[in-house]
Amino acid sequence: MYIEVTGYGPALVLIHGWAMHSGVFAPLVEQLRAHHTLYLVDLPGHGYNHTTLTPLALPHVVHAIAAATPPAVWLGWSLGGLFALHAAATLPQVRGLIMLAATPCFVRREDWPHAVEVSIFTQFAEDLKQNYTETINRFLALDTLGSTYAQSELRQLRQILNARHTPNTATLQAGLELLAHTDLRRAVIDLTPPSLWIAGQRDRLVPAASIHAATALAPSGQTELLTITGGGHAPFLSHANQMTAALQHFIATLP
């Protein structure tokens, strides 16, 4: 699996969200590459890895990334957070975990009320079969909904998406299945490495309340929470400086 490597310093793995590719992290890469060696992952079926045979499944993807990277901090945005969290729960080489607009359980359950209804993801899966482009555009709009800079972020996401190979319908449906049916709350309870959880105050896809609830599950004393005021689901586009400072501070404090 192809992983782009850039920069110099302590290793940081970055994993993107649904339908996107690692180019979405450009605002962070610009500031972090002077201080960190960045491993920019395109998930199977996405971007530069659009032809890889690795299944879009947690253990397969995590194993492939781990085989190509040194001990590192793992950052996952949105869907990418599930892969980063699974890695942190199963691999000793994960020095720290950064969950960016990501939660161990993306859908509402009886004992997990601060999340979206599962129908959001199942409906997107159905709509993909009818109109691929319109469905992608609606999801990107949901990514930016509520953000102080929603229109600017939406333009950026559309440009970024089209800069590399776009994933096919089967790949996108596999990602939606992960979002709809994965529950890694037990992994949070048992976390060994320190973790930083970043929420967008105005995120409509992963409400800040769900990330706050996730941090309450994590071991006390090694868990940090940052809420980006005015941020939506992609706060690294609108608040890159604040994000960069938070990431660098967290990584600098790791043992």
UniProtKB/Swiss-Prot annotation:
GO terms for molecular function: pimelyl-[acyl-carrier protein] methyl ester esterase activity. The active site is at residues 78, 203, 233. Its main location: cytoplasm. The keyword Repeat does not apply. One of its GO terms (cellular component) is membrane. Belongs to the AB hydrolase superfamily. Carboxylesterase BioH family. This is Pimeloyl-[acyl-carrier protein] methyl ester esterase. InterPro entries: AB_hydrolase_1, AB_hydrolase_fold, AB_hydrolase_sf, BioH. It is found in: Cytoplasm. GO terms for biological process: biotin biosynthetic process. The keyword Metal-binding does not apply.
